Amino acid sequence: LIGATCIQCTSPKQKGGENALPQKSELFANLPDCCPTPDGMAIAPNGDLILACPNFADITQPACLMRITKNGEITKWMDVPVLEETGWASPMGIAFNEEGDLFICDNQGWSGAEKAQNKGRVLRLKFENDQLKETITVASGMEHPNGLRIRNGKLYVTQSSLSQIKDPSGLLVSGVYCFDMNDRDVAVTNTLEDKNLITTVITKNPEVQYGLDGIVFNEAGDLFVGNFGDGAVHRIKMDVEGNVLTNDVWAKDTTQLRTTDGMCIDDKGNIWVADFSANAVARIDKDGKIQRIAQSPDCDGSDGGLDQPGEPIVWNGQVIVSCFDLVTGPDKVNTKHDKPFTLAKLSLE
């Protein structure tokens, strides 16, 4: 275990008077050196916060899962089982089922390495007394598995790129896959022949060709997915059999939300979205109205700034945000990867 690290447990206050936006993010935690690239999060059965660290920023650090307790202790829980062909794992979206099994999007191809192309997996980790007992490959051969949610015994996974599916426009196609929770060794081809591919979208922004990413369900069973490059959130309605009835742009306002990375939903039905490129977090109400809640300039995150936010999660009455802090480019506020490695926090209200 990594030595315990203290975190700040108080909620950030509204700072509308000091800032044009409703809130200013605050520091939630400094992460140890074994977690230079924090990403997806999920709440464990015992209430701990589990953080996936694909560690793209430092490949000498094995991809791992961190555990954060309610009293502020941060420890390394375990390394994620690697794919033998590549020698690494790349955990991004994660989710627990009711039995306490952890499902992981192992986005092998994120780095762009040729040997990892179309080698992405969905893993199911089974535990006994908090120790890994069995690793099951639910699906393999995936191009870019990213976000993951569980509903009614099914796994819903976003694939941010499906480059083998060609749209006449030449624009990027991405989609949502659905697997049974008990599936094993599903061979994905990343084509329209995949029976598990339930819907696709096109990313229309030619400057940012990166597709479906964040994913969340509301209480009614509507599925919401973020089309990253377009800064749009789609609402997908399904029948009782899980067949897609509609897939429409539900919320879009690029003045408030430029890119849609990880997403979560609060008890009031508001969807919180990490605006990765803009160093911001937005909140979308039940009517689809988007409001930017907080934004940071290029920063190192040491003062609680949103240092390229990757995913939010509601935990213990706050919104915790992972700071990916790695990708640069013309559309990104972030200019470099740097220490410290952080999680930020926002108030729910």
For every predicted segment, state its role.
Residues 3-19:
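Bacterial Sec-dependent signal peptides at the C-terminal "C-region" and cleavage site
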Residues 16-35:
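A short helix->beta-strand "capping" segment at the edge of beta-propeller domains
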Residues 52-54, 105-107, 158-160, 226, ...:
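Residue-level marker for isolated small/hydroxyl-bearing positions within beta-strands
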Residues 125-130, 179-189, 236-243, 348-349:
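Short loop/turn segments immediately following beta-strands, especially the blade-tip
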Residues 33-48, 55, 61-62, 82-102, ...:
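Beta-rich, blade/repeat-based domains predominating
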Residues 26-29, 74-81, 133-140, 187-202, ...:
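Beta-propeller fold detector
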Residues 57-62, 109-120, 164-174, 228-231, ...:
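Short, solvent-exposed loop/turn segments at conserved positions within beta-propeller repeat blades
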